[in-house]
Amino acid sequence: MSPFADTFYQIRMRYGIRQKELAQIMGFEQTYLSAIEVDKKGPPSNEFIHRFIQKLQLTELEASQLFDAAEASQRKFTLNKELHQDVFWMMRDMRARLPELSTVQINLIREILNLKDTLAQKPIETIRPIKRRRNQEAKM
């Protein structure tokens, strides 16, 4: 299940509204809402999301979660043509292996992607220069 389908369903359940009622409130077919919840349809348009937020009077946090989930649920995306060719090769490998990735592998990949942010947050350690001794003859 996509993040949007899950978030949409969880919000509807939290507000205690049946699909049929929500369809009437929003002016959509109940079958369309069902298709969204069971992930047969990709995330809906921003207009749909705004209407859902408005009709249920969602909080800012819920609205933010819904938009984040919609973005995460996009099934197609386009690579910027200016990217380094290694990115294209990496994405080809990712597409081929996505169905077989374990949760551990997915979490590791996400950690690696966040590594730059983590490194930026750590303070830079200053290295003290080594003091050299003056040239002296060794005692024997």
Predicted regions and their residues:
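A short, Lys/Arg-rich alpha-helix, primarily the initiator
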Residues: 1-14, 108, 139
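Conserved hydrophobic/aromatic packing and binding residues within compact polymer-binding modules
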Residues: 8, 22-23, 33-36
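Short alpha-helical "recognition helix" segments of helix-turn-helix
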Residues: 20-23, 52
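Recognition helix of helix-turn-helix/homeodomain-like DNA-binding domains
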Residues: 27-43, 51
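DNA major-groove recognition helix of helix-turn-helix/homeodomain DNA-binding modules
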Residues: 47-65
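Short, charged recognition helix plus adjacent turn
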Residues: 64-97
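C-terminal regulatory/oligomerization modules of transcriptional regulators
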Residues: 89, 94-140
